[in-house]
Regions:
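Short linear regulatory motifs enriched in tryptophan with gly/pro/ser
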Residues: 1-180
Length: 180
């Protein structure tokens, strides 16, 4: 999956079973990307929206509950990509490309995992792509007027090229253990 509009590209390759619900996929995406699952989300697959129905965020297309549909059920054999939006305020759009559909027994290690990726996920509530660009300008320039406040806000140094697949997999495993 690719975080749309990011340059350089922020992307992750994950492996998940086809019998996983969209709600569970959402948690795997969160862990792999580095998001904290602090905001609403939705998937749009073949024009149908799936998510957590919320009266405040009613769209023209009614949302179906993402915990009631598996990947197998919504993807079939024809769907090769779909979108995932996280944080409707910041509007993080992800394009998810389907490489292959596997059953759990065929998966490496038998559990969902992040296989590869590049570049750090933007901090939560940074303000979308525009806010992220401003954040990067401030954090990378010690003379920038907002440098110190942005470092404090994000909790210290931030490496936009930083991505650790092992850390992503620890987060995925942690969520899987909590979900059991």
């Amino acid at each position: 999956m690719v975080l749309e509009g990011s340059e350089p590209k922020i992307w992750r390759q994950i492996s998940v079973p086809g019998n996983m619900t969209l709600a569970d996929l959402e948690r795997i995406i969160q862990a792999a990307m580095g998001w904290t699952n602090s905001h609403l989300h939705q998937f749009t697959i073949e024009g149908q929206v799936y998510g957590v129905p919320d009266d405040e965020w009613i769209d023209e297309i009614p949302s179906l509950p993402d915990d009631e549909f598996t990947l197998d059920a919504v993807l079939g054999k024809e769907v090769k990509s779909f979108s995932y939006e996280y944080d409707f305020g910041d509007g993080w759009q992800h394009e998810v490309e389907v490489k292959m559909v596997m059953i759990a027994d065929e998966m490496l290690n038998g559990w969902p995992m992040c296989l590869a990726g590049a570049n750090a996920c933007p901090p939560e509530d940074v303000g979308g792509l525009g806010g992220y660009e401003e954040f990067l300008e401030a954090i990378q320039d010690p003379l920038h007027e907002d440098h110190d406040s942005m470092r404090r806000w994000c909790g210290g140094p931030f490496d936009p090229k930083g991505f650790d697949v092992n850390s992503a997999n620890r987060d995925i495993r942690r969520w899987l253990l909590e979900a059991e």
